From Swiss-Prot:
Species, as recorded: Cupriavidus taiwanensis (strain DSM 17343 / BCRC 17206 / CCUG 44338 / CIP 107171 / LMG 19424 / R1) (Ralstonia taiwanensis (strain LMG 19424))
Family: Belongs to the UPF0502 family.
Residue ranges with Polar residues bias: 1-10
Ranges annotated as spanning the membrane: none
One Pfam entry name: DUF480
Protein name as it appears in the record: UPF0502 protein RALTA_B0914
Endpoints of the signal sequence: none
Amino acid sequence: MPSTPESDPTQPGDRPARPALRPLTPVEGRVLGVLVEKQHTVPDTYPLSLNALASGCNQKTARAPVMNVSEAEILEAIDGLKSLSLVFEGSSSRVPRFEHNMQRALGIPSQSVALLALLLLRGPQTAAELRLNTARLHSFADISSVEAFLDELASQTPPRVVRLPRAPGARENRWMHLLSGEAGAAVAAEESARNTDGDAAPSAELEQLRTEQQALAEKVARLQGLVEHMAAQLGISADEFLG
């Protein structure tokens, strides 16, 4: 029998249909992804203050696209996410702090939450890239495990992710989230079509570039985690620490 989201199952299972959410705005998607990420990478400072949330939304690494949003825009996004029960504001601190409610609101396990967060933060990725990039949020046993949770998200009503057509020279399909609605899927489909019209790069060269990119991303993620931990110990944001 399927487990409830709170039981954090290790394997996906069939789940009842959930009410369709309105499409998220780009800033709402970024805020939601950051809250999920920081819950795992800087648990000592989670739930996040507005300042920490702004720092996470605007950080230059592990983000695609890089954004530059104001605190006013973030507060507007938080209000929108609150109306969808995706974000709560804590009441136990004089400084407002915010936490996500993605697992309960969407009725999905934490593994799926991690995958959606990385798709929100970094855009379309292959299952292999997602396994690497979610390492600090959840350790998937293998790529097949990642694909199983992605397949479940894709089969939900409404679907939460979609598998994109394979790009020229690529060995794997990329996945993208559908939390921003069908419009986001259309943009990704057009991008894929443009790639298909171009000259295909040699498979070996493309695979080498992907390998190097993944290795670099892993190093950057480790460094980012170290910076965030040190900044948290000093009681400042990561940007202030680096500045």
